[in-house]
């Protein structure tokens, strides 16, 4: 319910918080570029020249994707929802069913980034693809129960694809 609570108003409630389309992009890019250079230095021997030459285009595309994430309805997101940052309870009364860890990447962004990262880190590709539409529909249902209106499964799918960096130009 984190996303629903701040849906469309997180920017105003957290004006100093990092935002995907403004304060996050430029500080993040040197890390991407440095990681890419290190990867080429250590593993370049097994990469084709076209992969090695793709770095500038990838970085430019990633900047664009981050900006476009900020053009969506934004809310407060965890920013690093992976299976290893989630603890699942055992269903006993009084225990939280899910606890999120590692809040260092919290920001204001497209909420589907969180869902995209979780589903892609927690399921094998075939299983995820088979049930993605169900997950997105359930997410939209939960938003509606929490008072968010007008967010369709089609919009969720579009935002989800962008959150996965699958909507590059």
Language-model segments: what does each one mean?
Residues 105-148, 166-168:
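Active-site activation/catalytic loop segments of kinase-like enzymes and analogous catalytic loops
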Residues 148-164:
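All-alpha amphipathic helical-bundle segments outside canonical DNA-binding/catalytic cores
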Residues 1-4, 161-167:
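Short, intrinsically disordered, charge-balanced linker/junction segments flanking boundaries
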Residues 83-121:
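Catalytic activation segment of kinase domains across protein kinase-like and atypical kinase folds
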Residues 70, 74, 79, 108-111, ...:
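Active-site-proximal structural scaffolding
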Residues 2-6, 61, 80, 84, ...:
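Generic, well-ordered alpha-helical scaffold segments in large soluble proteins
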Residues 1-78, 89-94:
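ATP-dependent phospho-/nucleotidyl transfer catalytic cores
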Residues 75-77, 99-102, 159:
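Extended hydrophobic secondary-structure segments that form protein cores and membrane-embedded regions
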């Amino acid at each position: 319910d984190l996303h629903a609570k701040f849906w469309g108003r997180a920017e105003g409630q957290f004006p100093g918080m990092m935002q995907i389309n403004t304060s996050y992009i430029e500080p993040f890019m040197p890390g991407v570029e440095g990681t890419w250079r290190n990867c080429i230095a250590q593993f370049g021997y097994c990469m084709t020249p076209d992969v090695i030459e793709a770095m500038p285009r990838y970085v430019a595309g990633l900047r664009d994707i981050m900006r476009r994430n900020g053009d969506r309805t934004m809310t407060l997101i965890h920013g690093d929802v992976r299976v290893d940052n989630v603890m699942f309870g055992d269903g006993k009364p009084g225990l939280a069913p899910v606890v999120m860890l590692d809040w260092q990447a919290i920001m204001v962004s497209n909420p589907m980034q969180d869902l995209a990262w979780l589903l892609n880190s927690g399921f094998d590709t075939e299983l995820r693809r088979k049930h993605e539409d169900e997950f997105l529909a359930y997410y939209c249902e939960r938003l509606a129960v929490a008072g968010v209106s007008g967010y369709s499964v089609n919009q969720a799918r579009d935002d989800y694809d962008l959150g996965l960096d699958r909507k590059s130009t």
